């Protein structure tokens, strides 16, 4: 089954040439972006890495996302990419894995790695084959053009989380560590925005707690802060999955808000790029 783009023309351009140019400008942005283009990949990724990446419209979060993909390229070309995104639509299964076929973007198609899907499904108590959770969801889709831009041809496993409980995060982390035994060069992307629709000062404070939990590599601290500080982070389950995978290092690459782009600091959304290795 081919999954057609749901948010091309909304979150990012629907024309190939315009999309390539916008991604280029996200990398070359010197105010919020890294100010440089990624170098061509010359090596293979040898060990698993995790990436925290935002998923708003490219005009807002694209320059922050570019930091993560610029760094990921330096580790090498992945053998497979797993993208974990939150379910914003309420459709489908609690933990939905798109099982086969390919995903289309204006830059071409990306095949689903069926062997990697099999490994995850056979080692998870919660993950299920599911198309419906992905049909209208944007959180996974917006990562794919960046992947295509920096790596060219890759294969992937899309996982959409309606259930973002600690039990699911621990379960998925265990399944992904089994996957890494067969695909050592796996790149796992946790697609998330941080605090939503509060003023700049409040969002910077709340986002700092999320950043602390990631730097501490502590999933329990993440869940504790979400409740204690009332943080409206949408993709915390994917991030908690990464924090359960025993990465030795966590590096914060860039944090900004939509207000840093638009100038409107009254209701902003926080964006973060971080890499775990």
Curated annotation (Swiss-Prot):
One Pfam family linked to the record? Memo
Q: Which family does it belong to?
A: Belongs to the MEMO1 family.
State the protein's name: MEMO1 family protein TRQ2_0860
Under the heading CDD domains, the entry gives: MEMO_like
Kindly give the InterPro entries that the UniProt entry links to this protein. MEMO1_fam (IPR002737)
